[in-house]
């Protein structure tokens, strides 16, 4: 009977912990406004450049001048882009010098309204790809599995289509398409 009581208490305790943990990642409703997509992407690139330089990773920006304005919450979207670039940099860094190539991340915009973050890190297996946006799933030793969940929620609330996968050319692409 004590074993059942302990199990029940642990279940309630774990349930309470997960609920509290989930509250930490509550995402506010987007406050949308017309935003120049190229300006937002350029600002994020400048913000993340130092971190990439510190890791000996080249961060490139390729903006299509035909890309115009989109309706989005600039603050939430900045955090999405920062998280994606940070994840790409950490992936490249985890591969280390063994890869024998210069780490590169390219942030690209394409008309009418597409953002693509491309990296030459070690890539994502098909098995991992299927789990990427699941809560608490992480490929990092100390990862908590909430970064991509945050990204998924923000993009969904903005009505964006998105994908993250490694292609046959070995490059990993995070694509965000605005509707």
Language model features by range: what are they?
Residues 1-179:
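Core catalytic ATP-binding domain of two-component histidine kinases
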């Amino acid at each position: 009977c004590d074993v059942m009581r302990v199990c029940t208490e642990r279940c309630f305790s774990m349930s309470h912990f997960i609920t509290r943990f989930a509250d930490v990642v509550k995402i506010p409703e987007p406050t949308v406004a017309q935003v120049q997509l190229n300006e937002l992407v350029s600002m994020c690139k400048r913000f993340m450049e130092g971190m990439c330089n510190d890791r000996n990773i080249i961060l490139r920006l390729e903006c299509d001048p035909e890309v115009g304005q989109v309706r989005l919450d600039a603050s939430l979207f900045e955090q999405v882009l920062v998280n994606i670039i940070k994840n790409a940099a950490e992936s490249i860094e985890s591969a280390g010098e063994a890869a024998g190539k210069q780490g590169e991340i390219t942030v690209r915009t394409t008309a009418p309204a597409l953002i693509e973050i491309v990296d030459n890190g070690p890539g994502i297996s098909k098995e991992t790809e299927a789990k990427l946006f699941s809560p608490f799933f992480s490929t990092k030793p100390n990862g908590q599995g909430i970064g991509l969940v945050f990204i998924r929620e923000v993009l969904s609330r903005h009505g964006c289509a998105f994908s993250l996968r490694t292609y046959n050319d070995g490059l990993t692409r995070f694509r965000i398409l605005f509707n």
